[in-house]
């Protein structure tokens, strides 16, 4: 079964749901489909989920041309809260998720990668928590999930600099669980997913939940703190100055307020 939609295609085979972000001309920026995610995580016939990107990249985060735009009656808090609720819900589902990561995984795209149970990465991957470059911070679990994988110091480095992490270093640091050449990433992810899908679904889901309970509560509490921090940053003069500087192609002049 294959279902193609503008933001995400979905395919089902051998008990595996394969969700593909489908905006390759923009490195999949802003791509996604909540209904596809809901189906994959709830449908009883789905035993394991793969999330990947069409084209050269996994997902390059929010479309930066739309930053700061939203429904006129929506508060900054509610704007971030919608994304936070979606992330928390995805973390609480019992089905295993594998991220097959090629090319760019930036900002929210990187956070989607981090929320998976396993990450198969490519040697050409470029990972980045880019939010600080826009005067804001990760708001869907980036600081929390990355810390569980690579520790506080390296997470602070990525959060505070916005620098890129290449695929080899991501594997060495523990962001990627498997490292493949770009042409082999999807096949490796499917191999793992088929193996999991062939196991007892009750045992698989319970096993995932047993491991998750060791740290997931702390991560979710941290994600809620990200929500408060981000909605506060949206109100600062420095955030507005950063956006203006990007538009005007100049260095920002921050006032620390």
Residue spans for each PLM region:
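Short, active-site-adjacent cap segments at secondary-structure transitions
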Residues: 56-60, 106-107
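Short, charged, surface-exposed hinge/linker loops at domain edges
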Residues: 208-217
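Conserved CoA-thioester-binding segment of acyl-CoA-metabolizing enzymes
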Residues: 1-54
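Crotonase-fold acyl-CoA enzyme core
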Residues: 89-202, 228, 235-236, 241-244, ...
């Amino acid at each position: 079964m294959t279902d193609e939609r503008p933001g995400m295609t979905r395919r089902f085979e051998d008990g595996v749901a394969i969700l593909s972000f489908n905006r390759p001309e923009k490195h999949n920026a802003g791509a996604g489909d909540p209904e596809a995610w809901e189906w994959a995580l709830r449908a009883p016939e789905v035993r394991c989920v793969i999330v990947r990107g069409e084209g050269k990249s996994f997902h390059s985060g929010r479309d930066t041309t739309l930053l700061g735009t939203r429904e006129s009656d929506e508060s900054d808090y509610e704007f971030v809260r919608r994304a936070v609720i979606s992330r928390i819900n995805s973390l609480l589902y019992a089905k295993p998720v594998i991220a097959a990561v090629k090319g760019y995984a930036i900002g929210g795209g990187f956070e989607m990668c981090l929320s998976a149970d396993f990450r198969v990465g490519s040697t050409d991957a470029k990972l980045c928590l880019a939010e600080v470059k826009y005067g804001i911070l990760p708001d869907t679990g980036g600081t929390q999930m990355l810390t569980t994988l690579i520790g506080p110091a390296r997470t602070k480095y990525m959060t505070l600099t916005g620098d890129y992490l290449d695929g080899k270093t991501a594997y060495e640091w523990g962001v990627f669980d498997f490292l493949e050449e770009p042409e082999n990433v999807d096949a490796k992810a499917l191999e793992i997913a088929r193996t999991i899908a062939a196991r007892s679904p009750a045992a698989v889901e319970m096993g995932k939940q047993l491991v998750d309970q060791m740290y997931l509560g702390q991560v979710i509490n941290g994600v809620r703190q990200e929500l408060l921090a981000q909605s506060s940053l949206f109100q600062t003069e420095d955030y507005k100055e950063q956006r203006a500087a990007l538009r005007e192609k100049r260095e920002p002049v921050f006032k620390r307020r």
